[in-house]
Curated annotation (Swiss-Prot):
This is Weak neurotoxin 6. It comes from Naja naja (Indian cobra). Keywords: Acetylcholine receptor inhibiting toxin, Disulfide bond, Ion channel impairing toxin, Neurotoxin, Postsynaptic neurotoxin, Secreted, Toxin. Disulfide bonds join C3-C24, C6-C11, C17-C42, C46-C57, C58-C63. One of its GO terms (cellular component) is extracellular region.
Amino acid sequence: LTCLICPEKYCNKVHTCLNGEKICFKRYSERKLLGKRYIRGCADTCPVRKPREIVQCCSTDKCNH
């Protein structure tokens, strides 16, 4: 599995996930409209959502755009 890993909206940095990591995720604050920063990466399970945060998980290559 390969996931995107950069904080910008349009991302093309790809990371090959470790064995056992079967999920790509993207998380970001639902409050910031301008200058939104994304946290992207690989995970073994979908990260838990914090208050006022959006978390999206998927399981195909580069799906966390």
